[in-house]
Amino acid sequence: MHYFNRAKKAKNNEFYTLFEDIAAEVACYPNAFKGKVVLCNCNDGYQSNFWQFFQSQFHALGLKKLVAIAFNPLGNSYQLNFDGKEIKELPLAGNGSFDSAEAIVLLKQSDIVVTNPPFSLFQDFVCLLAEHGKQFLVLGHNGAVGYNQIFKLFKEEQLWYGHTVNSSMLFQVQSNFKLYDPKSVNFVKKDGQLFQKVPGISWFTNLKKNQQPAWLKTKSRYQGNEHKYPKFDWYDAIFVSKVKEIPLDWFGYMGVPLTFLNCFNPKQFELIDCLANPYATLDTLKTNAYVRSHHGDVRNVKGKRRYVRVVIKQRQNVI
């Protein structure tokens, strides 16, 4: 999260996804792309690995059409179209931003969006896709779950994690990347190119997975172990340190790690809220006004601020 926050403040915060990482995730949805129009609307022209991957795998995936938009912050840009035989480059009147009028026209004509949007615009990007009812497979940071609209989509079962979750991934960055630190182990130089290792990266999607997460089973119990599950100072829920420590005999509210969302089964649990900031993301329990007036922090447990927690509640009669 540290590097993510710093990158949000940098002007050149683009992270370019590696070919092999795209291939590994797309392979988990073998039938999702057949006969579909794929749009890569946060693209970097011909050199983008999203463009190169889908062009090279066009026939293997059974695509109908591939469209990519090249973003040019300094002036007019272009779009790329590929029908399996010929590449056509067409000029755009604007800079190719994903939220421009031209890009939205192309979005409406597409079936699936696959790309790596700027981290700082992740919520705006995903909300735009959801607004237009599009299927998507996009990269983002785990911390994005704490954004109001992103968590709301999780809660409404319109968004979930892909197959690669909470991973430390290498991204190619610009050679003049302002946050580059040659002494840091998080930067790698290879064949004249610069890469940064970014922790906590996940794929986010609304594509159907082959299997729904299995029923969560743990050996942990609340009764007799109350000391292991202290309550949050400013929120009426117990604190759970690890997913494997979720007590299955507890039916009240509990704050669990973000990684729980990777095994979330809506038939077993209900998503209530997210404690990502001093205040609850959705304010489901209407606590924020009180917490704000007393300068509290809903993440605190015994005065110590904890990392992001998802508030869940177990459904009755599920043990």
From Swiss-Prot:
Keyword entries, A-Z: DNA-binding, Methyltransferase, S-adenosyl-L-methionine, Transferase
A Pfam family the protein falls into: EcoRI_methylase
Reaction(s) catalysed by this chain's protein: a 2'-deoxyadenosine in DNA + S-adenosyl-L-methionine = an N(6)-methyl-2'-deoxyadenosine in DNA + S-adenosyl-L-homocysteine + H(+)
Single GO BP term: methylation
Keyword match Zinc: no
Induction behaviour: Detected after 6 and 96 hours growth, there are fewer copies at 96 hours (at protein level).
UniProt xrefs under InterPro entries: DNA_methylase_N6_adenine_CS, EcoRI-like_methylase
EC identifiers of the protein: 2.1.1.72
Gene deletion effect: Essential it cannot be disrupted.
GO molecular function, one term: site-specific DNA-methyltransferase (adenine-specific) activity
Protein family per UniProt: Belongs to the N(4)/N(6)-methyltransferase family.
The protein, known as: Type II methyltransferase M.MpnI
Species of provenance: Mycoplasma pneumoniae (strain ATCC 29342 / M129 / Subtype 1) (Mycoplasmoides pneumoniae)
Source taxonomy: Bacteria, Bacillati, Mycoplasmatota, Mycoplasmoidales, Mycoplasmoidaceae
